[in-house]
Amino acid sequence: MEDYVKIEKIGEGTYGVVYKGRHKSTGQVVAMKKIRLESEEEGVPSTAVREVSLLQELKHPNVVRLLDVLMQESRLYLIFEFLSMDLKKYLDSIPSGQYMDPMLVKSYLYQILEGIYFCHRRRVLHRDLKPQNLLIDNKGVIKLADFGLSRAFGVPVRVYTHEVVTLWYRAPEVLLGSPRYSTPVDVWSTGTIFAELATKKPLFHGDSEIDQLFRIFRTLGTPNNDVWPDVESLPDYKSTFPKWKGGSLSSMVKNLDKNGLDLLAKMLIYNPPKRISAREAMTHPYFDDLDKSTLPAACINGV
């Protein structure tokens, strides 16, 4: 830690306080995340240190770079590249009655998918994607923060400040208690973020797990074994759930064209193996008119 100096506290993340800092000798500005773990007394579990150290290998223009993992008095500090704005703050800053430029929505979504596909290829899930951990710069680049941290530290029910972790972007298989889930959970979250990019409003803003599920069901229909094999045997599925018909997605997301709505619907398919993958989503006709050569990952994709 002696290599870094804290400049100011910039926020409270899922796992602890986040500071803006500077590397003393290079002057590089960084984000310093102090990780608070439930089992504080025993110090940091070695498995968490191992897991998180692997994340230093994730090097992609749309993934916030983990620069260093440091221990100080049984506290873990993660040193990340610094970006000053997150997507939630940006969406909140757009004046009432105005919306994000449709081409920027498209560019941001494509870049998010680039970052997700890169991590999924490396068997790393996010599990907690939301506008607060999508960071942007002033050049139109968006980057995913906190990729892989859920595996190292778990996804807490409450932030260490006792604020409840948001459920708005959580996939239905997670909400229904599925013990096994995989990469489609991140695609679902990205779909809900896609809708929010277009409308500035969260698509499903539940205030409890059951309210969250019911908001999804009202919009997309209550799932059963016909549309999602074995959903009725998931731990938190109840045969007493109201049977909504759904079919109201397009009326809730007015600012998307036909291709955008088609892609969104494919990202929000209930049955996880049938849900579009990040890689498949990137080839969807919605992106046909996006100039991919200007995107930050173009150089590594050979566009």
Swiss-Prot record:
* Record bears the keyword ATP-binding: yes
Gene Ontology terms describing biological process? cell division; G2/M transition of mitotic cell cycle; mitotic G2 DNA damage checkpoint signaling
- Show the active-site residues: D128
Kindly list the GO molecular function terms attached to this UniProt entry: ATP binding; cyclin-dependent protein serine/threonine kinase activity; protein serine kinase activity; RNA polymerase II CTD heptapeptide repeat kinase activity
* Classification via InterPro entries: CDK (IPR050108), Kinase-like_dom_sf (IPR011009), Prot_kinase_dom (IPR000719), Protein_kinase_ATP_BS (IPR017441), Ser/Thr_kinase_AS (IPR008271)
Give the matching CDD domains. Answer: STKc_CDK1_euk
Supply the name of the protein: Cyclin-dependent kinase 1
Write down the species.
Oryzias curvinotus
